[in-house]
Amino acid sequence: SYGYDEKSAGGISVPGPMGPSGPRGLPGPPGAPGPQGFQGPPGEPGEPGSGPMGPRGPPGPPGKNGDDGEAGKPGRPGERGPPGPQGARGLPGTAGLPGMKGHRGFSGLDGAKGDAGPAGPKGEPGSPGENGAPGQMGPRGLPGERGRPGASGPAGARGNDGATGAAGPPGPTGPAGPPGFPGAVGAKGEAGPQGARGSEGPQGVRGEPGPPGPAGAAGPAGNPGADGQPGAKGANGAPGIAGAPGFPGARGPSGPQGPSGPPGPKGNSGEPGAPGSKGDTGAKGEPGPTGIQGPPGPAGEEGKRGARGEPGPTGLPGPPGERGGPGSRGFPGADGVAGPKGPAGERGSPGPAGPKGSPGEAGRPGEAGLPGAKGLTGSPGSPGPDGKTGPPGPAGQDGRPGPPGPPGARGQAGVMGFPGPKGAERGVPGPPGAVGPAGKDGEAGAQGPPGPAGPAGERGEQGPAGSPGFQGLPGPAGPPGEAGKPGEQGVPGDLGAPGPSGARGVQGPPGPAGPRGGDAGAPGAPGSQGAPGLQGMPGERGAAGLPGPKGDRGDAGPKGADGAPGKDGVRGLTGPIGPPGPAGAPGDKGESGPSGPAGPTGARGAPGDRGEPGPPGPAGFAGPPGADGQPGAKGEPGDAGAKGDAGPPGPAGPTGPPGPIGNVGAPGPKGARGSAGPPGATGFPGAAGRVGPPGPSGNAGPPGPPGPVGKEGGKGPRGETGPAGRPGEVGPPGPPGPSGEKGSPGADGPAGAPGTPGPQGISGQRGVVGLPGQRGERGFPGLPGPSGEPGKQGPSGSSGERGPPGPVGPPGLAGPPGESGREGSPGAEGSPGRDGSPGPKGDRGETGPGPPGAPGAPGAPGPVGPAGKNGDRGETGPAGPAGPAGPAGARGPAGPQGPRGDKGETGEQGDRGIKGHRGFSGLQGPAGPPGSPGEQGPSGASGPAGPRGPPGSAGSPGKDGLNGLPGPIGPPGPRGRTGDAGPVGPPGPPGPPGPPGPP
């Protein structure tokens, strides 16, 4: 006969012809005596009598925590209970026929030997066959049921209760806290499991309710761009002889903007820094003073049932019991291991052919085989004709317009011009002469002492964005920061009106094939669900093959290498519940959490005298769950208890509140629009049919012949605007757009009338520094006055490195300078302004009549005048050569979402690939050990709202999800009114027995 092997339960077995009955086996060896029964644990004490619970008394004044009482002496161990009866020894059963080798059973708990079962019916004697080889000894039978615990011994006498410490004097009342700002009311979190009640902390005086907080802004503005690096400050020349103040020159036209340089290569990514060491746990602060107890709050919701407690320690083994009488006959033992195959006997004469048996039941389907090797990819078929263009879908809503982008970085300051020669003492003004040629720049003078700081100048025009700098080396990893408090939930902004849908562009010609890309990038975000495909024709089902005979079991081969994990197989039927496994070892103690904030240090009271133990009072009402206490010291590991029954699945937790809306990123540059292709012919719109119910998915049939190309349908009516979809992933920043053309310079203003220079007055005494006046409007440039005599050549200073000259702009028409205004009183010293770009050099004036005067003594440096306006922005210099490729920088945060670009042209439809064969379902692997729960990651910022995706098909109902993490504790709500006194509750459960008292 063919046996049934559970390890190959999936195969189909074919019943073979019945073989001749073998000889009756010899009686098996006597069974091993059962193990010694465990002594039962001591009996539980009787339940104390319960009476009706009286009303709760008024709360007494809070007292300080008294000093720890003296530890009670260990109680005497209880008397050992009488030994339980010993199970009867079973009679030896008859040895069964050698069966197939069964799988190894789970090791159960050693229990007392069970009662022997009734003897089986005697088999009919079979025809004498050849004597087989003696079979091997059968495996050890499954352990019997665990013996019942013996009668419990008498309970030990209850020890005296320890003396209760005297209540300390009440601590001082803490000062009333300032009224807090009420935050947004947090969503009600799922009630977590009721924790152990911790020690009551100090209760401060209730603060006054604060005013309602203002509504949050719609969203913060984008971060301002980083200022460009200022250029190198030129050396200050030696203070020369103060010359006559020159007239400001006319403002020249701005030159054309230079082309932008190519972006530099992306640097390599730096090595990650070493993780910082975890900081030491802070010391536990002393408990603060106990505040005045407030009125009792409303009764909280009933907490969930706590987790099952750890099993108690196993009692000491009792003395061996008396030997019991013989028990009833035990159940027959398990089949023994199959013996070695005996030598083949002589072939007997064939017997008469028996009648044809009835067909047997169909065997179980075999297990799915290993997945076959992946077939070779076939050659691509010829491209089929283009399919019909479907009707256009409804236009999606335009996204909300993003806020303006951050200002670009400030451009670098232009090259500092060389200072001109200082003029000598002003002579008698001569008649204005003709304009002479421009003189050469003099050498720079020696660096003078730094002057007082001038007032801060106005902010200059926005410079062009600088090229990105090289990626710096990664800094060392800092210590882990403390977790911040959860921020208040912002007010959701108003949803903007949907913009009009843009017209669809014409299809452009396909572009040339691009170069081969680099390494594969990171996997992208999961895309939205596509539209359901067309249902294929069901294929023909093949004929089932005949099941082959079951072969002999081969020897176990060497263990192969671990294969690749297969796909998730079809879930099998739920098997029977196996015997309970051995209890696992207790897990390691987790790391201690961060210590909470320390309360104010209270004054330590003097320890009171030890009072007499009072009678136990009635059990009070169940108070609200207290805060979690500090983790206690790790105790000694107890004996492993028996595995409890699996509890029912908890209810599904409520859906958490939506997270705060993240900041809307700044719009990126608008991409270039592609070239338009030739427009196609417009077809007639087809009639829209009724949408039928979706049918069952059939097997994919063979691809049909390509159909004719249909005409393009007309544009359908615009559908209703759907609700906004979930926020999409932030797309990569688009390429920068081309620079616009620079406008032409404006015409010069009218020339002012020339003024007559007045005589030079006598220098007055230096006045007191007055308050800085308000900055007046800039006047028109005046006419040029007579130029002074040229000054003597100053000492040459150290020449600085000259930067690359920028392109020279077209010279502007110089207007006539106006007359010099009176010197105003010096203003207060302000902060130094930024270095402005050098203005255009004026023409050199004529030399006036008269001999040059002797140089005057250098006067005291005058007060710094008001800072002038920033000059015109210099032209952008040519792009320098590309520097060496730096190390690749770490991946930066996602950039702001750019504006929605124009809809690209629809590319040509690609060839339809050959449908691959469906892979075999892999064998279901063994369940791995449960991983340790990871830490909860920080909440990510919510992205901007993306367009609504197509409606997906209804998915199968998922399993009940686990309870979500409890939400953050919301701010305290307003104080509720005092409720009516409730009815007296039922008596509480009896408390745990107290510790044994001293003997």
From Swiss-Prot:
Glycan attachment sites: K101, K915
Composition-biased stretches (Basic and acidic residues): 65-79, 900-914
Residue numbers carrying Allysine: K7
Record's compositionally biased regions (Pro residues): 169-181, 648-660, 804-814, 849-864, 984-999
Entry annotated with the keyword Membrane: no
UniProt xrefs under Pfam families: Collagen
Residue numbers spanned by region Disordered: 1-999
Compartments (UniProt record): Secreted; Secreted, Extracellular space; Secreted, Extracellular space, Extracellular matrix
Modified residues (4-hydroxyproline): 27, 30, 33, 42, 45, 48, 62, 77, 83, 92, 98, 125, 128, 134, 143, 149, 170, 179, 182, 209, 212, 224, 230, 239, 245, 248, 263, 272, 275, 287, 296, 311, 317, 326, 332, 350, 359, 365, 371, 380, 383, 392, 401, 407, 419, 429, 432, 450, 468, 474, 480, 486, 492, 498, 510, 526, 532, 538, 547, 565, 580, 586, 607, 613, 616, 625, 631, 649, 658, 667, 679, 685, 694, 703, 706, 727, 736, 745, 754, 772, 781, 784, 790, 805, 811, 817, 826, 832, 852, 855, 858, 930, 933, 951, 966, 972, 987, 990, 993, 996, 999
Function statement: Type I collagen is a member of group I collagen (fibrillar forming collagen).
PANTHER family: COLLAGEN ALPHA-1(XXIII) CHAIN-LIKE ISOFORM X2, SI:CH211-266K2.1
Protein name: Collagen alpha-1(I) chain
